[in-house]
Amino acid sequence: MWGIPAAIFFIAFIHRVVPGVIAKDVMQAFGATGAIVGLLSSMYFYSYAGFMIPAGLLIDGFGARSTIAAGAAVMGAGSLAMGVATGEPLLFAGRFVVGLGATVTFIGALKIGAAWFPPSQFATLAAVTATVGVLGSIAGTYPLAALVAVAGWRGAFLILGLLTLVLATLCGLLVRNHPAGSAAADAPAPSLAGMAGGMILVLGNRHTWPPFLAFFFAYAAMGNQMLWIVPYLRDVYELSTTQAALYASAPSLAMLASGPLTGYLSDRVVRRRKLPYTVLTAVSLVIWIAFVATLGTLPLGGVFALLFAMGLAGGAFVLTWPLGREVNPPSLSGIAVAVVNLGGFLGAALTQGPLGAVLDARWTGVSVAGARVYPLAAYHAAFSVCAGFTLVALLVTLGLRETRGENIHHQLARGVAARSRPAPRGGYST
């Protein structure tokens, strides 16, 4: 039952990274600037971020099967719209709609899996589902570039759209929300008022914001790197799109191991959250500085090694969710995870357009077949901003609360109550 929703999530992740592969094609087809390409990419993240909370309500209210099938149909329609777009408005609308449909895929796959697998296997299920997403991001690099080379970028979107519609149909016909006779089928859906109240409590908790902001800036760097690494390798190293996409897959390949390994080490070995998050973010900053310092001079093997190292250190992101969950009431764990997860998508959405403008500001007027060719100085400026994002993420991690893998909300609440209690008259508070 979980396989079809997971396959839909796989395609959603392909769409997340696809603009990096087709950036030059979009420039050629529409005369687009770097800022336009960045804004196009961000449309996915804007819709994903804006619809993340309602997506959870829909899944709980209408069932995962129907919601995933509808989301996949919407995502497929958006992909088809991008494939036939003759102007930027339809291209942007299609990208936005793709993100809208993709919003339900991860939550829905977990919901289906949780109903069909024992509770003791949920952590493994979540890790495997996240790994499916990483595999999708890999498929969105070299394999997608190979498909574009054969079918063209429009053909690739049409193929993805049709495949997604087939999966939507299979989901509606074959997937079931619960095993027959399951008690979960009778569980009441959360009310809108209850969800809103929980959201207010989570947002009002000051300990929610450090993991939110750390993920915001970390994913701002990661998202922009995924968007511009293929154009960088094409413009500076004169690689083909297919060759550049092969190198661009390095971070995702590394995350296949680093994400699960980071979670395991945090849970079972060091039994810390803040410490590994801070250390790995510091390592990421060092790698970013090395990457920026060697732009255009490092052999391609060295570029691949640095990108792979970025992916290894980037495994820190998996700690964002437990850090958000463990400082909030256990009954609000779902909302807490959704809120801190929102930080990463907003980080990508709000920065990709402006970073494209940074490239445009340093463009020297050179174009090839209608696509802008940016000089090394432009990429140096853009990737330096990404390094700056990582620095801010590191500083934010210093404000994280160490949970040691346990929910500490009650401890934090008692601490607030103790500080707000007036000291005894004539004495001192301790």
Question: Which residues are covered by each model-predicted region?
Answer:
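Paired small-residue
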Residues: 74, 78, 89-97, 301-309
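Extracytoplasmic
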Residues: 1-34, 50, 225-230, 351-355
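Helix-breaking motifs and short loop linkers at transmembrane-helix boundaries and internal kinks
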Residues: 31, 63, 84-90, 118, ...
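Helix-loop-helix hairpin linking two adjacent transmembrane segments in secondary transporters
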Residues: 129-179
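Extracytoplasmic gate region of multi-pass secondary transporters
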Residues: 19-21, 205-262, 321, 348-356
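Cytoplasmic helix-loop-helix junction between adjacent transmembrane helices
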Residues: 94-133
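Juxtamembrane intracellular "pre-TM" segments in multi-pass secondary transporters
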Residues: 178-212, 414-430
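Conserved MFS/SLC helix-loop-helix module at the cytosolic interface between two early adjacent transmembrane helices
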Residues: 50-89
